[in-house]
Design a protein with these regions (language model features):
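A contiguous strand-loop segment
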Residues: 1-71, 89-104, 109-116, 125-157, ...
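N-terminal start-of-chain detector that recognizes signal peptides
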Residues: 19-21, 79-82, 200-205
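Conserved aromatic-histidine-acidic binding/catalytic patches
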Residues: 63, 76-80, 219, 223
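A gly/proline- and charged-residue-enriched helix-loop-helix capping module
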Residues: 72-87
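C-terminus-biased signal that marks the final domain/tail of proteins
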Residues: 87-91, 100-103, 112, 136-237
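Short acidic, glycine/serine/threonine-rich loops at helix termini
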Residues: 120-122
Length: 237
């Protein structure tokens, strides 16, 4: 399970949390003293991360956590209480039946029993996609959802290049039997290929579109200007 976290605040840190429920390690902002985490793994092997989704339906106007984005609270609660991917679905069901969710998100989940699924969530509905049902056994998302609208005309802020580049890298690794943690860290997490750029060498000794020699614009690359932290979790059955 992997996520590049793209946010304006580059001061990020991991916390170890043990409040009497399931202990976990979670990613949050430096000096954050609220119960909000944006990726993590707990002591029983359940892990979660998310990305914003910009093509789903209506989000809730507010809920018991307030009026702001609730992805940090949802993931903190999941890490403290969930043991399996199915447990996370139960958590989402409880929110559907209550006040809903204020931020549309793609939640990637993973557990120690072999479960792996992506939940595309809007205010009062979600769509589950299991890795076991995917053609090659992996799931990739950026800032749009497969169950949402507009897939034939994806604007740049949805991250189409980031999605397509990561997807193609995973596909080539699976096809060549080279999908390893090292591949994800070295070839995917740090990838700087811009739109329509098949590959590149560093230092880059070429021209990309109208840029100066040796310059790759990194606003829409997998590892980009706003990438503030990385989350990755590997579990071997």
């Amino acid at each position: 399970l992997w996520k590049n976290r793209d946010v304006g605040n580059s001061n990020q840190e991991y916390h170890y949390v043990d409040d009497g429920r399931i202990p976990f390690i979670g990613l949050t902002y430096r000096n954050e003293d609220t119960f909000q985490y944006y990726a993590g793994v707990n002591a029983v092997g359940f892990a979660v991360e998310n990305s914003n989704s910009y093509n789903l339906g209506r989000a809730a106007g507010g809920n018991g956590w307030g009026w702001g984005d609730d992805d940090g609270e949802i993931q903190a609660l999941a890490l403290a209480t969930c043991r399996t991917v199915d447990d996370f679905q139960v958590l989402l069901d409880s929110l559907d039946n209550a006040e809903g969710r204020t931020l549309n998100s793609n939640y990637g989940t993973f557990d120690a029993f072999g479960g792996a699924a992506m939940f595309e969530t809007e205010g009062f509905e979600y769509f589950r996609h299991d890795a076991a049902d995917a053609p090659d056994g992996y799931l990739v998302r950026s800032n749009f959802s497969y169950s949402g609208d507009g897939l034939d005309n994806r604007p740049n802020y949805w991250g189409p290049n980031r999605h397509d580049r990561a997807f193609n890298l995973f596909k080539s690794a699976v096809d060549d039997n080279q999908l390893t943690p090292e591949f994800v860290i070295q070839r995917v997490m740090r990838n700087l290929a811009a739109t329509d750029m098949n590959d590149y060498d560093l230092p880059y000794r070429n021209f990309y579109e109208g840029n100066e020699f040796g310059v790759i614009p990194n606003g829409e690359t997998v590892c980009r200007a706003s990438t503030a932290s990385i989350f990755g979790y590997v579990f071997s059955l």
